[in-house]
């Protein structure tokens, strides 16, 4: 798994780091993860990139010119900053789904941590069968964190 540290993903990244069955590759920039995942796929490995949606936006050129162009199945686990109930980065939140749609990348939204394992398995199978990236948008609730609820 190729990851970039992020406070919202800290618990997930700690799990990745501690899993002996996972090769963890920390990144400096998210688009590096697209190249690393491509290389892993070309030698027969499954790979996922974990990033925030801002990093996903930064990676769009690499996603289009590599993953989509050469039909590389990579699972994109993207923290959904600015999702409903998350008062940070509202512009990023508003643009995340339209950008995925414009790129033709199928995506699913994880809102309950109970669904995580099954959703990841199914998304990985879809990516492999379609030979395309598939994204899972990780919400605060989906990661088991409380949503920010404003007082009215």
Provide a role label for each language-model segment.
Residues 1-152:
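Thiamine diphosphate
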